[in-house]
């Protein structure tokens, strides 16, 4: 998988709650150029350069290079990043999910990775957990899977 540095890169964080704010703070400390947040309210927060309401997601995705998903599991967030929205991301974009596995359509993600429609992805959360041995994600191109441990790590 191609490597992209945090320094001087732009990030979009889907979910500006506790996890999203912690991610933004760490990215800022490592030199991220711009951090955009998406939340239910779109209310500004000092951890983000810009914050938009979730209703703007389809407008933000086409200009997203690195998407960090930090959403809770609610009826509104189930498969919020679905096949149609994955298709809105640029082909050189990365998807990182550290929130809840239900927020991402994993079959659509695997299909996009295998078709070269995304540069790569990293998943710390899946649905279900643990991921079954025969799940197509295990064979997806340019995918890193970790066992839901990112919250216990220190930088």
Where do the model's predicted regions map?
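Flexible, glycine-rich phosphate/dinucleotide-binding loops
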Residues: 20, 43-44, 152
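Gly/Ala-rich phosphate-binding loop of Rossmann-like dinucleotide-binding domains
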Residues: 24, 28, 113-114
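Residue in the alpha/beta-hydrolase core beta-strand immediately N-terminal to the catalytic nucleophile
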Residues: 10-12, 94
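Short beta-strand "acidic-cap" motif of Rossmann-like dinucleotide-binding folds
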Residues: 35-37
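Rossmann-like adenosine-cofactor binding region
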Residues: 33, 42-136
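Glycine-rich Rossmann-fold phosphate-binding loop(s) that bind the pyrophosphate
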Residues: 16-17
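Phosphate-binding beta-alpha-beta segment of Rossmann-like dinucleotide-binding domains, i.e.
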Residues: 1-10, 22, 30
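C-terminal helix-to-coil terminal segments
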Residues: 129-155
